[in-house]
Structures are given as C-alpha cells and as structure tokens.
A protein has these predicted regions:
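Concave beta-strand-loop units of leucine-rich repeat
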Residues: 1-126
Length: 126
C-alpha cells in the first residue's frame, strides 16, 4: 500500500496508530479528520512518506515536532490548522519539501520569509 486517503472520515489518533506498520506508504491524506498532535507520533516510522495532508485538523505547532522527522516529505498540507511562526522553525530542516500549504493559519510573512531562507526551493502557499 503506497497511498491512503482518509480525508473526511472519523479516524482519530487511535485509528492512525495502526498505520505505523505501513512502511511503504508514500501518500497519506488525513485532512478534515479528528487527528491531533498526539496521533502524529506514530507517523514517524513512515520513512518513505512524501505527501502528508493535515488540512483542517487539530494539529498545532507541537505536532510539527513529529513531522520534522519525516525527512522524505515533499508536500505538507497544513491549511486551516493552528500553526504559527514558531512551528515553522521545527520543519526548517525538511530539505526535500517542495510545497507547504499554510492558508488559514496564523503564520505571518516574517515566518514564511525565515522558512524560505532554510528551504529556498519550497513553494509556500499562504
């Protein structure tokens, strides 16, 4: 299994805990679900994950502590989450990141500009 789209389902942190055995997963869509920061801890084993969509979830800056370990990520959707400038610092080492969606967050131009210094090849949609 390489692609798993669980968008707009009732999946919770408990439900995604079983995903850590899916090591070949490259695309995971958890947008519009009940997933929180605590649930993201189990995703760190998904070393091949390239696309992760967390739009409209309860994810905060704290959740990016786990996301920063997904070094293969190329796409990260954080639309309409509680991310701030402080959280962006946590993902500044995701050197493979090509696209970051931040629309509807509290991130400012200052945060975006600081992140672009670390990830110049990343398109940031805000």
């Amino acid at each position: 299994l390489r692609t798993l789209r669980l968008s707009e389902t009732n999946i919770t942190d408990e439900g995604i805990s079983c995903l850590n055995g899916l090591g070949s997963l490259t695309v995971l869509d958890l947008s519009y679900t009940k997933v929180t920061d605590a649930g993201l801890k189990c995703l760190v084993r998904l070393k091949q994950l390239k696309q992760l969509d967390l739009a409209s979830t309860a994810i905060t800056d704290a959740g990016l502590t786990h996301i920063k370990k997904l070094t293969a990520l190329q796409f990260l959707g954080l639309y309409a989450t509680a991310e701030t400038n402080a959280g962006l610092q946590k993902i500044s080492r995701l050197k493979n990141l090509q696209f970051l969606g931040l629309y509807g967050t509290s991130v400012t131009d200052v945060g975006v500009n600081n992140l672009k210094k670390h990830l110049p090849g990343c398109t940031i949609n805000r």
